[in-house]
Amino acid sequence: MIYNAKEQKTNLHNMQIDTISFGSGKKSLIMIQGLNTRGIKGASVSLAHLYRLFANEYTVYLFDRRPDVPEGMTVRDMASDVAAAMDALGITNADVFGVSQGGMIAQYLAIDRPDLVNKLVLAVTLSKNNPVVESTIEKWIVLTEQGNIKELVEDMAIRMYSDAYVKRYKPFMPLLTVMQKPKDVNRFIKLARACLTCNAYEELHKIQCPVFVIGGQQDKVVGGIASGEIAEKLGCEMYMYDKLGHAAYEEARDFNDRVYAFLTGKENS
């Protein structure tokens, strides 16, 4: 199996959540993905390849959101689920890498369960609402409720990627519309609404571990200013891509290198 990639179910709260693991390292890395339309099931090999840089140093884990998302679920609730999954697998003192909504969840994980977090990476995320994220999420919810998946996928691409990237891949938009159609519309809407429940800013001082903030100045999903707010509040290390936006984690070739260097203290050779 490529990079020892595996898929399994993790039992918690009388339910099972999809779990991906890969890598063969002694240390644990918890990756918390952002809002997505499809979930992580079936993505173990592609994710292992995308984050192969971490596979020797770490055993990497990703936990999907719970299958039945209750109305009004918050990102803090999701952090509680991640903590429960880590407890179920006996994982403690892990490095944690949260992207977008995953970064919101990661903040609450570090605040509420400091025993679980050794180092923390907060990528293209926020700690409190702002007009950019509010308008973005509200539009995505409306488009989903209307069943306008074509415009939803196009709007996601325009807001996430650089203009050059969107122009290059515009011919593939019809294919993306099919591939990114939400499997469960109601679940996606509830998860999207949860993006507006992050209010960790006034509790950031409770985070006890080293933190690295990384983002894009041109972020049209959560706003480029959001990363700076977190880093200033924590007094932690930060790196911003001047010409990239929310999908800096995909577009920047050195993105994983920077995360790896912070977490391990090693340069990628």
Where do the model's predicted regions map?
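Conserved HGGG/HGGXW glycine-rich cap/lid loop of the alpha/beta-hydrolase fold
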Residues: 9-69
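Conserved acidic catalytic loop of the alpha/beta-hydrolase fold
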Residues: 77-94
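Conserved alpha/beta-hydrolase "nucleophile elbow" surrounding the catalytic nucleophile
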Residues: 94, 98-103, 216
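Flexible "cap/lid" loop of the alpha/beta hydrolase fold
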Residues: 104-107, 111, 118-147
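Conserved alpha/beta-hydrolase catalytic His-Asp/Glu region
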Residues: 131-134, 150-203
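Short beta-strand/loop motif that positions the catalytic acidic residue
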Residues: 207, 213-215, 219
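Conserved alpha/beta-hydrolase "acid-adjacent" motif
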Residues: 220-226
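Catalytic histidine-centered segment of alpha/beta-hydrolase-like enzymes
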Residues: 244-257
